[in-house]
Regions:
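Conserved RNase H-like, two-metal-ion catalytic cores of nucleic-acid enzymes
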Residues: 1-53
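Metal-dependent phosphoesterase core characteristic of DEDDh/y 3'-5' exonuclease domains
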Residues: 18-31, 57-165
């Protein structure tokens, strides 16, 4: 089974009004993958095609049960893009770390610092990411989304190391 850590960047928090602007993915043995496109439908089609080509996979996120997966579903519905049912194909590292309890504190950056992985963001914060997309600064956008995917990957590996997976 291919394990893929991923992260979405969006223009806001509402999947009915806001859109996905970047998807970053990291897996063992593969190069990092970043999908971004001004046309959200094309981006979603590329994402689902990538997963389909992976065959047997597990999609690993951070807070994805409450955010990323919802965005993927709602935005794909909007654009009539064929999806893969992710119900039994995902792992949410935040839920796993909290043993299934939906404790709302603890950001990805905090978990990363906790396990000793400190990414380099070039000073960007999540709230500034839509500006990178708006100003077509795709290099910084790609770097940001892949750093989040890497943080998720390292957290997932630590959860396996300590026996929570």
């Amino acid at each position: 089974m291919k394990e893929i850590a991923f992260d979405l960047e969006t223009t806001g928090l509402d999947p009915f009004k806001d859109r996905i602007i970047a998807i970053g993915m990291v897996s063992s043995g593969d190069e990092n993958v970043v999908i971004t496109n001004k046309d959200e439908k094309i981006m979603l089609e590329q994402f689902w095609k990538y997963l389909e080509e992976c065959g047997n996979f597990k999609l690993i996120g951070f807070n994805n049960a409450d955010f990323d997966n919802v965005f993927l579903n709602i935005r794909s519905l909007k654009h009539n893009v064929k999806m893969i049912n992710l119900k039994y194909k995902t792992a949410d590292t935040r839920l796993i770390a909290f043993n299934g309890w939906k404790y709302k504190k603890g950001k990805l950056e905090q978990f990363s610092e906790l396990i000793g992985y400190t990414p380099k963001y070039n000073g960007w914060s999540g709230k500034q990411i839509p500006l990178l997309w708006k100003h077509n600064d795709l290099d910084d956008l790609r770097n940001y989304v892949i750093q989040d995917a890497l943080m998720t990957w390292f957290l997932y590996q630590r959860l396996k190391d300590v026996g929570l997976l």
